[in-house]
Curated annotation (Swiss-Prot):
Gene this chain is encoded by: SUF4
Lineage: Eukaryota, Viridiplantae, Streptophyta, Embryophyta, Tracheophyta
Domain of life of the native organism: Eukaryota
SUPFAM superfamilies assigned to the protein according to its UniProt record, in alphabetical order: beta-beta-alpha zinc fingers
Record keywords, A-Z: Developmental protein, Differentiation, DNA-binding, Flowering, Metal-binding, Nucleus, Zinc, Zinc-finger
Chief site of localization: nucleus
UniProt protein name: Protein SUPPRESSOR OF FRI 4
Length: 367
């Protein structure tokens, strides 16, 4: 714990005006002359409350503020005499010291982060406690009977399994199995006429050791047949003739016949390209020609006299009515017609006359 600093030079100062003095007696004389002096008879009093009582009893006046004081420190409720009676927070703010001391610093403990590969194995018979904080009492190691030391048996590492294919395969095409060792990945899209040599369809099987005659555990005597991945999207080009696969699969044990070249072509044609658009890629949708017989109520006519552009599925709207614009056509519709007041009054009068005649006719029929 740190010791609290003592004020080397505690100068006295006035609470009302923050003026510093060398002696408290001089401060008291200053307060009597500047802050506790009656403004009527100029009598010097000792405290602010004494000044208030004097002015009230003698001069019949009320004093609510201490004269010649700063804003916020002119209250007459606080009893000040020299340095006595000053609130603690004002003293703290004046001397620039904090009321509470900062907490003691805690020693920072750094835990070394060692990689997993660099951990040294410990003997079976002892368990070491974790690293202790400096200054704490270390715990004693604990002992327990452990299993006898044995040499670990040699473990043959298996090669990582290949990921499964998530795209469907074409059942009509015969895909030869690829060897597990010496596998060469196929491209995403089939590349033709590139002059590439085919990958060997099989690799020599692992032979047993000539000395022991035992195959190492975990490795099969013959590599399993792995399917060759097919392209993600089947691509068929009509300009390039389809070719047979550079290699063929071995005949199965059952003696099934290998599919012919015609079957392979038929199965390849079963997957048409997805970019086929009815009417061609440059097809456009054109409306019928304009109706030049006369103005008609309805949407404006559409004409397509422009040559088709490269962008597909476009509709060109052209207003070809030279006698009437789109606004005039809209104003000719009954929905947008505007009636004048004369026609409206005539229609109202006609409706009233019709009602009167109907009522008279109904009265005659009642008799």
């Amino acid at each position: 714990m740190g010791k609290k600093k003592k004020r080397a030079t505690e100068k006295v100062w006035c609470y009302y005006c923050d003026r510093e003095f060398d002696d408290e007696k001089i401060l008291v004389q200053h307060q009597k002359a500047k802050h506790f002096k009656c403004h009527v008879c100029h009598k010097k009093l000792s405290t602010a409350s004494g000044m208030v009582i004097h002015v009230l009893q003698v001069h019949k006046e009320n004093v609510t503020k201490v004269p010649n004081a700063k804003d916020g420190r002119d209250s007459t409720d606080i009893e000040i005499y020299g340095m006595q009676g000053i609130p603690p927070h004002v003293l703290t703010a004046h001397y620039g010291e904090e009321e509470d001391e900062p907490p003691a610093k805690v020693a920072k403990v750094e835990i070394p982060s060692a990689p997993l590969g660099g951990v040294v194995p410990r003997p079976y018979g002892m368990v070491y406690p974790p690293q202790q904080v400096p200054g704490a009492v270390p715990a004693r190691p604990m002992y327990y009977p452990g299993p006898p030391m044995r040499h670990p048996a040699p473990v043959w590492q298996m090669p990582p399994p290949r990921p499964q294919q998530w795209y469907p395969q074409n059942p009509a095409l015969s895909v030869p199995p690829a060897a597990h060792l010496g596998y060469r990945p196929q491209p995403l899209f089939p590349v033709q006429n590139m002059g590439m040599t085919p990958t060997p369809t099989s690799a020599p099987a692992i032979q047993p050791s000539p000395v022991t005659g035992v195959t190492p555990p975990g490795i099969p005597t013959s590599s399993p047949a792995m399917p060759v991945p097919q392209p993600l999207f089947p691509v068929v080009n009509n300009s390039i003739p389809s070719q047979a696969p550079p290699f063929s699969a071995p005949l199965p044990v059952g003696g099934a016949q290998q599919p012919s070249h015609a079957d392979a072509l038929g199965s390849a044609d079963a997957y048409p390209p997805n970019n086929s658009i009815p009417g061609g890629t440059n097809a456009h949708s054109y409306a019928s020609g304009p109706n030049t017989s006369g103005p008609s109520i309805g949407p404006p006519p559409v004409i397509a006299n422009k040559a088709p552009s490269n962008q597909p599925n476009e509709v060109y709207l052209v207003w070809d009515d030279e006698a009437m614009s789109m606004e005039e056509r809209r104003m000719s519709l009954p929905k947008y017609k505007v009636h004048d007041e004369t026609s409206q009054m005539n229609s109202i009068n006609a409706a009233i006359d019709r009602r009167i005649s109907e009522s008279r006719l109904a009265g005659r029929m009642a008799f």
